[in-house]
Amino acid sequence: MNTADSSLLADIREVNLSYLLLAQRMLRDDYAASMFRLGFSNEVADILMRLSPAQLVKLAGSSSLLCRFRFDDYSLLSALTQDVLGGALQQAHATILLAKQPVEQLA
């Protein structure tokens, strides 16, 4: 493995760990709102809440990103890029579009 590949893998692990730690913190602070914001089902949120720091580090060590870019819908992405009413309308529209997306579960 060359230096660029190992650097990329290290960056992926760092993003994964940051994401998992943030998700746990969000769920502890406001479980229901965080499930909505993260797009988690009850089962996934419960599992994530129970993971120990060692388990988080092990899970973060994956060579794949654990978080998913949810802006794969043109209408959602365009809603976020239009400045209407100082951004309030676009934020509401984006929230509605995100809420319509199905909750994905860890396989």
UniProtKB/Swiss-Prot annotation:
Q: Which domain of life is it from?
A: Bacteria
Annotated compartments? Cytoplasm
> InterPro entries, per this entry?
Flagellar_FlhD (IPR023559), FlhD_sf (IPR036194)
Swiss-Prot/TrEMBL keywords: Activator, Bacterial flagellum biogenesis, Cytoplasm, Disulfide bond, DNA-binding, Transcription, Transcription regulation
Which SUPFAM superfamilies does this UniProt record tie to the protein? Flagellar transcriptional activator FlhD
Q: Name one Pfam family in it.
A: FlhD
Q: What's an example GO BP annotation here?
A: bacterial-type flagellum assembly
Q: Which GO terms describe its cellular component?
A: cytoplasm
Q: Name one GO molecular function term.
A: DNA binding
Q: Which residues form the signal peptide?
A: none
Q: Which Gene3D superfamilies match?
A: Flagellar transcriptional activator FlhD
Its annotated function is as follows:
Functions in complex with FlhC as a master transcriptional regulator that regulates transcription of several flagellar and non-flagellar operons by binding to their promoter region. Activates expression of class 2 flagellar genes, including fliA, which is a flagellum-specific sigma factor that turns on the class 3 genes. Also regulates genes whose products function in a variety of physiological pathways.
As for family, the record states:
Belongs to the FlhD family.
Subunit comment for this entry? Homodimer; disulfide-linked. Forms a heterohexamer composed of two FlhC and four FlhD subunits. Each FlhC binds a FlhD dimer, forming a heterotrimer, and a hexamer assembles by dimerization of two heterotrimers.
Q: What is known of its domains?
A: The C-terminal region contains a putative helix-turn-helix (HTH) motif, suggesting that this region may bind DNA.
Q: What protein is this chain from? A: Flagellar transcriptional regulator FlhD
Native organism: Bordetella petrii (strain ATCC BAA-461 / DSM 12804 / CCUG 43448)
Lineage, top ranks: Bacteria, Pseudomonadati, Pseudomonadota, Betaproteobacteria, Burkholderiales
